[in-house]
UniProtKB/Swiss-Prot annotation:
Expressed in tissue-resident memory T (Trm) cell population in non-lymphoid organs, such as skin and gut. Expressed in innate lymphocytes, including tissue-resident natural killer (trNK) and natural killer T (NKT) cells in thymus, spleen and liver. It is found in: Nucleus. This is Tissue-resident T-cell transcription regulator protein ZNF683. Disruption phenotype: Mice show a reduction in tissue-resident memory T (Trm) cell population maintenance in the skin, gut, liver and kidney but not of splenic T-cells. Double knockouts for Znf683 and Prdm1/Blimp1 result in a stronger inhibition of Trm cell population maintenance. Display an enhancement of natural killer T (NKT) cells migration preferentially to the white pulp of the spleen in response to chemotactic stimuli. Also results in the derepressed expression of a large number of genes implicated in the egress of tissue-resident T-cells from non-lymphoide organs. Gene3D superfamilies: Classic Zinc Finger (3.30.160.60).
Length: 458
């Protein structure tokens, strides 16, 4: 028997219970004798109860041990004339009911009453014009009768990752309007502001929101690929008064940022400078120091110094370098300058020693094709050109040009020299003596050239 009593004491220890009656809570030990709660004839048991501080809720609930089970009985104020049997039926309905269900029902009733009061208070406020009305959301929230403490946060917000969330429900952000508070009227909770460090997903939008958003895409970020959220560095104010003042600034920031994004590079100011065209000028003609003439609807590319005509504008520009003395192309080895790039490339062959052009008759090589053409005239026996000032016939191609230049300058050159007739006569005589000296030293005579060509052919 002692072993059975010890086992019973270990399985069913002394049951301490609390009695919630009106504004006081009382505790008692199960070992003390208690009167029957149904009969309620002997009230001497209430004198042995120890009054405790006020309970958080007014619930006439009494816990009474009956055999090894714990039964809950409700103490209700009954009107006069009601039979005790009716009280027994009410008490039997409350027997064997788990404490958690009763607690859940009371909590749900409190939340329901609280929500209804909040909605009545918010409904009395006047509606604000010039902004769309926000209907209450009933699809994404569960029924008020369910136990909100027993449900996990993933039930309300399935897109959130499993993070530590406090007991206060998170606050959602709905469409941002300058004159509206942060939350819509039906869901403006009275909970205090929570620090954003403990709740990284505090400012979240529901995944299936039916309200249009005003904030631009640059202010919203995606968290783990689901549900847009506002970045943490853009902290929002939770109280409605401060947000009403900050709503206009947020809207203006969004508009200014979108306007900056839609600007073209030409409208960016200093970052993309625009080119201003000179009035009355065309592209490509700005480099010329003088206007071009037109004849029969065509532009004449004529040099204003020597009057030479060209078929293209680029050729005229290259020709103008001869008169201006400009030589933009310089050799990196000998620092020699040239007016054209082709002349510089040809000059590089002198430093490299390359001779790409070869004569097919004597297999002599040349650095340029023009020199090869001049050399081929020796093998062909072509008659040389005759000088207009003297009866000499010259075979090489370079020598007739030099001969003509030294013999007598052109009339156009004579007009620029402004020399008298006597000076011109002396110059012609000097040219004649110089030509004779060159011919003697170089051996450029007609007879010698003809004999050399005949000997090679024979």
């Amino acid at each position: 028997m002692k072993a059975l009593d010890g086992l019973r004491e270990s399985l069913y220890p002394s049951l301490d219970f609390q009695l919630y009656q009106d504004d006081q809570v009382c505790s008692a030990d199960a070992s003390q004798p208690l009167a029957d709660s149904v009969g309620a004839h002997d009230l001497a048991w209430s004198e042995r109860m120890c009054p405790l501080p006020l309970a958080p809720a007014k619930s006439p609930l009494l816990a009474c041990p009956e055999s090894p089970d714990l039964c809950l009985c409700a103490l209700q104020k009954t009107p006069l004339g009601r039979a005790p049997q009716d009280l027994g039926e009410d008490a039997s309905n409350m027997r064997h009911q788990p404490p958690s269900l009763y607690k859940a029902s009371t909590d749900s009733e409190k939340l329901t009453i609280k929500d209804s009061l909040n909605r009545e208070e918010m409904g009395n406020e006047p509606e604000r014009g010039a902004y769309p009305h926000l209907p209450p959301r009933t699809s994404s929230f569960p029924d008020a009768g369910l136990d909100r403490k027993s449900l996990s946060p993933l039930t309300f917000w399935p897109w959130l990752p499993p993070t530590l969330i406090s007991k206060e429900p998170p606050i959602h952000i709905y469409p941002i309007f300058p004159g509206y508070p942060l939350l819509p009227l039906p869901y403006l909770f009275t909970y205090g502001a929570l620090p954003s460090a403990q709740h990284p997903y505090l400012f979240m939008l529901p995944p299936h929101s039916t309200y249009p958003t005003v904030a631009g895409p640059s202010l919203l970020m995606t968290a783990s690929g689901s549900g847009p959220r506002i970045p943490q560095e853009k902290t929002l104010l939770l109280h409605s008064g401060a947000f009403q003042s900050a709503g206009h600034t947020l809207h203006s920031q969004v508009e200014s940022r979108s306007s900056r994004d839609t600007r073209t590079p030409g409208q960016a100011g200093v970052a993309a400078p625009t080119r201003r065209a000179v009035p009355g000028s065309r592209a490509g003609v700005i480099a010329l120091p003088y206007p071009l003439k037109k004849e029969n609807g065509k532009i004449l590319y004529e040099c204003n110094v020597c009057g030479k005509n060209f078929g293209q504008l680029s050729n005229l520009k290259v020709h103008l370098r001869v008169h201006s003395g400009e030589r933009p192309f310089q050799c990196a080895l000998c620092q020699k300058r040239f007016t054209q790039l082709a002349h510089l490339q040809k000059h590089h062959l002198v430093h490299t020693g390359e001779r790409p052009h070869q004569c097919q008759v004597c297999h002599k090589r040349f650095s340029s094709s023009s020199n090869l053409k001049t050399h081929l005239r020796l093998h062909s026996g072509a008659k040389p050109s005759q000088c207009g000032l003297c009866p000499s016939y010259l075979t090489p191609n370079v020598y007739p040009k030099l001969h003509h230049r030294l013999r007598a300058p052109q009339l156009r050159g004579l007009t620029h020299t402004h020399l008298p007739l006597a000076s011109l006569t002396c110059l012609a005589q000097w040219h004649q003596g110089a030509l004779d000296l060159v011919e003697k030293k170089m051996g450029w005579t007609v007879d010698k050239v003809s004999s050399e060509s005949k000997g090679k052919q024979g």
